[in-house]
From Swiss-Prot:
Membrane-spanning residues: 24-44, 97-117, 124-144, 151-171, 202-222, 232-252, 277-297
Gene Ontology terms describing biological process: CDP-diacylglycerol biosynthetic process
Family of this protein: Belongs to the CDS family.
Gene responsible for this protein: cdsA
Annotated source species: Chlamydia muridarum (strain MoPn / Nigg)
Transmembrane helix listed as a keyword: yes
Places the protein is found: Cell membrane
Biological or metabolic pathway of the protein: Phospholipid metabolism; CDP-diacylglycerol biosynthesis; CDP-diacylglycerol from sn-glycerol 3-phosphate: step 3/3
Protein name: Phosphatidate cytidylyltransferase
Membrane topology: Multi-pass membrane protein
């Protein structure tokens, strides 16, 4: 009786998560495929800024549960503007003066200086308040910035859509690891990897997630467009990336679980079937910098990081 109830709950929860995440992925793929057009680029910038603002707000809210932190709103606004400027400079880099990509960093610097003066009379003081605010902003907004650079890093080449291909590859491999790791871990997992930090993470789920990301990377490798083949140095690296992204996505999830455990909460927010923005982004926050670094190393001279 209890096993039957457990299985039905598991199936219902998994189906709900699968449907919601699948719809989100379909929407993202459609948006990314058209992201080189001005109207879609504007939507990409708006969506990225919104994700950065919400994610930073959730991270700041967790900090607030541990410390008398007063910069939740300012951190969110700072992240949103930082990402919006990044999207603008990344998409229009070829049309703007050299070193224009430094503009978001200049903004972040002066925003931090503004917070230093604003925090003089707060309990944590300038060092504590500004340090925590800067961490919350960087933890969420920098990976999103790197994702935008991956997306628009090939706009100067004869095949500008290769950035879209890499962005979809990154999301597909990482999120497939998330979904399959969750399902197989729930259904068959017994031995826990980190019972104190994240009791739901099991060895079976971890292995299943890595296998899923490898399979997805193999699909991308086998269907690599001929027009892209010459632009991708060392195509076999896609298979290796499947393993790396499966592992990095897992640890990205573990890192966020560590923050949530410290703040004594289950989800970063209360969105149905999602949890929170950080619960959606957690694995990508670690896997995105890895793909960005790989592109810098292997696509030297082609990728504008």
């Amino acid at each position: 009786m209890f096993d039957s109830d457990k299985n039905s709950i598991l199936q219902s929860d998994f189906c709900q998560r699968l449907v919601v995440h699948s719809l989100l992925l379909v929407f993202l793929v459609i948006l990314l495929c058209t992201s080189l057009y001005p109207s879609s680029a504007f939507i990409v910038g708006l969506l990225s800024s919104t994700c950065a603002a919400i994610g930073t707000y959730e991270m700041s809210s967790m900090v607030r549960m541990k410390f008398p932190f007063s910069f939740t709103r300012y951190s969110s606004i700072g992240s949103a503007i930082f990402v919006a400027l990044t999207c603008l400079t990344a998409r229009c880099k070829m049309l703007l003066p050299e070193h224009v990509d430094l503009i978001p960093w200049f903004f972040l610097f002066f925003w931090t200086v503004h917070l230093v003066f604003k925090s003089r009379h707060y309990k944590l003081g300038p060092i504590g308040s500004t340090g925590l605010a800067l961490f919350c902003m960087l933890y969420v907004s920098v990976p999103i910035r790197l994702f935008l650079h991956i997306l628009y890093g090939f706009v100067h080449t004869d095949t500008p859509f290769i950035g879209i291909w890499w962005a979809i590859f990154l999301i597909a491999t990482t999120k497939s690891s998330d979904i399959f790791g969750y399902f197989f871990g729930k259904a068959f997992g017994k031995k826990r990897i980190a019972p104190v930090i994240s009791p739901n993470k099991t060895v079976v789920g971890f292995v299943a997630g890595c296998i899923a990301s490898i399979l997805v990377s193999l699909i991308f490798y086998s269907h690599l467009p001929k027009s892209f083949a010459n632009q991708i140095a060392m195509p076999w690296i896609l298979v290796a990336l499947g393993i790396i992204l499966g592992i990095s996505g897992f640890f990205g999830d573990i890192i966020e679980s560590t923050f949530k455990r410290d703040a004594q909460i289950k989800n970063s927010s209360d969105l149905e079937s999602i949890g929170g923005m950080l619960d959606v982004l957690d694995s990508l926050l670690l896997s995105t910098p890895i793909v960005y670094a790989i592109l810098l190393i292997t696509q030297n001279g082609t990728f504008l990081g």
